[in-house]
């Protein structure tokens, strides 16, 4: 439920691009840069939050993240300057999402189940976040239609505070995890040094950059893009919602089959599939049917990357510092998110079209497939077992 709310609130921000820019007389690059800051803030604070969760427990981190999240949404409702926009929806919401989302919650879920059920748990957690995208985006659109965008943000800010209560059940499964692989004592700095010298880990970080580029660009700009080509604003909201719905199944299936299939090959397939889907979407004339099909296919591949990616981190280094090390991987994801969101707005303002960003997404998908291919699916030498299935 916590992941549902955290991811759901954030997924609705693309709906505010047009009303916020029109109300303040800004170009789309302004709010795009704010959303880019949000993604970068999320990435930086994800690594920090992961380290704090490993040290002090997930509950305290989630409560802190909830406060930042609610404050950022509330301040966005009264935004009348660029610096306030960047501070609210950018810095504060980004920090809030970092403390209430995958990087903090998924490691706690992994520790709560036996080793042979870890990938299943990762799939369930990722699917829960996707359910939030499916459920919350139409609700946000309805709130905007009924009360206006300012009141809608106020309602969301108050609702976000409820996430703090949902963190309490995580208490037994957060903080220090038993280093079940071999009882090797390692501090967080040593874990970071070990990871940064690991070639497969660095390839994983670079590939996850592409996932962030795709996801953030489409989430932030799809509603405005569809409106520009002649669709009703409701179509944009439902497109993002369909992505969330199909991702529930994609993420769950990805988590379930990651126990049986090669995680690196699964990731190669996902990224190539995205490139094919985007290419066909841009080449075939736009219609309601093509929007629905594209949204469904992209949704199925959307966060299907998370179970095998986080699973590879657990295989390589174990679960002791998984929140922190996955946070570093996620920082790569958010650097991609920053690039996708900001570049989308910048190119639109300078060229009047999103086409170049779509085709860049195709090229990056191919790049991601290539860098995942040589990843080694085995543990570091200090772990007792040569291969830990998770």
Which role fits each region the language model picked out?
Residues 217, 243-247, 253, 258-312:
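C-terminal transmembrane helical hairpin of 12-TM major facilitator-type secondary transporters
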Residues 44-83:
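Conserved MFS/SLC helix-loop-helix module at the cytosolic interface between two early adjacent transmembrane helices
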Residues 169-190, 381-388:
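Flexible cytoplasmic inter-helical loops of multi-pass small-molecule transporters
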Residues 125-175:
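Helix-loop-helix hairpin linking two adjacent transmembrane segments in secondary transporters
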Residues 13-17, 198-252:
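Extracytoplasmic gate region of multi-pass secondary transporters
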Residues 89-127:
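Cytoplasmic helix-loop-helix junction between adjacent transmembrane helices
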Residues 20, 99-113, 304-317:
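Intracellular juxtamembrane helix-capping segments at the cytosolic ends
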Residues 72, 84-100, 209, 290-304:
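Hydrophobic core of transmembrane alpha-helices in multi-pass small-molecule transporters
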């Amino acid at each position: 439920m916590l992941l549902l709310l955290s991811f759901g609130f954030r997924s609705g921000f693309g709906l505010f691009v047009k009303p916020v820019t029109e109300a303040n007389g800004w170009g789309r690059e302004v709010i795009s840069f704010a959303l880019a800051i949000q993604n970068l803030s999320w990435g930086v604070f994800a690594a920090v939050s992961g380290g704090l969760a490993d040290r002090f427990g997930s509950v305290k981190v989630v409560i802190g993240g909830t406060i930042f999240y609610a404050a950022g949404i509330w301040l966005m409702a009264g935004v009348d300057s660029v610096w306030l926009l960047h501070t609210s929806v950018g810095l504060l919401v980004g920090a809030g999402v970092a403390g209430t989302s995958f990087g903090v919650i998924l490691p706690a879920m992994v520790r709560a189940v036996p080793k042979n059920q870890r990938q299943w748990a990762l799939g369930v957690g990722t699917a829960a976040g996707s359910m939030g995208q499916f459920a919350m985006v139409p609700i946000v659109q309805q709130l905007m239609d009924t009360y206006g965008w300012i009141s809608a943000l106020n309602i969301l800010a108050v609702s976000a505070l409820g996430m703090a209560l949902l963190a309490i059940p995580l208490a037994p499964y957060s903080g220090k995890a038993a280093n079940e692989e071999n009882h090797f004592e390692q501090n967080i700095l040593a874990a970071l040094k070990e990871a940064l010298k690991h070639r497969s880990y660095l390839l994983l970080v670079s590939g996850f950059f592409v996932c962030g580029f795709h996801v953030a660009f489409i989430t932030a700009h799809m509603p405005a893009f569809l409106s520009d080509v002649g669709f009703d604003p409701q179509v944009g909201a439902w497109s993002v919602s369909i992505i969330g719905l199909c991702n529930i199944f994609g993420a769950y299936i990805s988590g379930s089959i990651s126990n049986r299939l090669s995680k690196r090959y699964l990731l190669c397939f996902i990224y190539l599939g995205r490139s094919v889907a985007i290419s066909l979407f841009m080449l075939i004339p736009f219609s309601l049917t093509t929007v629905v099909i594209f949204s469904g296919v992209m949704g199925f591949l959307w966060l299907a990357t998370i179970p095998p990616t986080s699973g590879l981190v657990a295989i390589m280094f174990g679960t002791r510092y998984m929140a922190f090390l996955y946070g570093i991987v996620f920082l790569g994801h958010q650097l991609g998110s920053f690039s996708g969101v900001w570049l989308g707005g910048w190119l639109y303002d300078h060229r009047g079209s999103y086409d170049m960003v779509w085709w860049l997404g195709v090229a990056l998908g191919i790049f991601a497939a290539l860098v995942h291919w040589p990843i080694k699916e085995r543990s570091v030498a200090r772990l007792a077992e040569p291969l830990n299935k998770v």
